[in-house]
């Protein structure tokens, strides 16, 4: 009851302290107006008090805003240069990154075999993505997931695509999958494979058999990534280099051509 009263007061304060809601914004000063708009979507989606409170508490992520408001910061690696992309992304040489992928597969061979048997996505692809996203679980991100997701969805250039993920992030808070303060990527990515919240809701699976799908379980996250690729047309046993059907499927994971080429480049060199 006390939480309900506090939430009601907080929401009322939010409504009274800002002008009319805004569907999307291009100025940081209007972030409160966007939160009002999003609150309407959140309540319509049936998200409860914990999720609504997380929205009240969410601040604008400066890291996310700077990245989204400056498109030139999102470039810098020439097309068709996957080795350079791997080095820039991983902080080591492409050759060393590929060696680390092989080592990670060797240490988790049973897990990868089980996932490939079920979904048809090879270990080389999954372990490459895992390494690129979080250095195999070594760094899961430093931005509060809710703040990153809400900031990204507020920006007018991004909101049609990313607002559903912001709502999903608040639903994950409401369900207890993450907390209001759980940290991840600057776009609201979470867990070992840095799923966007809406994608986790859609494709997250229980890979380790403990009865729940957990993005912070490496096995669950890997199985869920395989499920996402297979659900979007991955063809087991087929090549995945540029020009193939499977290469096109990689775009559902990340729409950057540089990223897709880097996955294919590394995974092809990792081998079986």
Question: What is the predicted role of each segment?
Answer:
Residues 156-181, 185-189, 193-194:
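Phosphate/pyrophosphate-binding betaalpha-module
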Residues 1-155, 171-177, 198-272:
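Cell-wall glycan-active module
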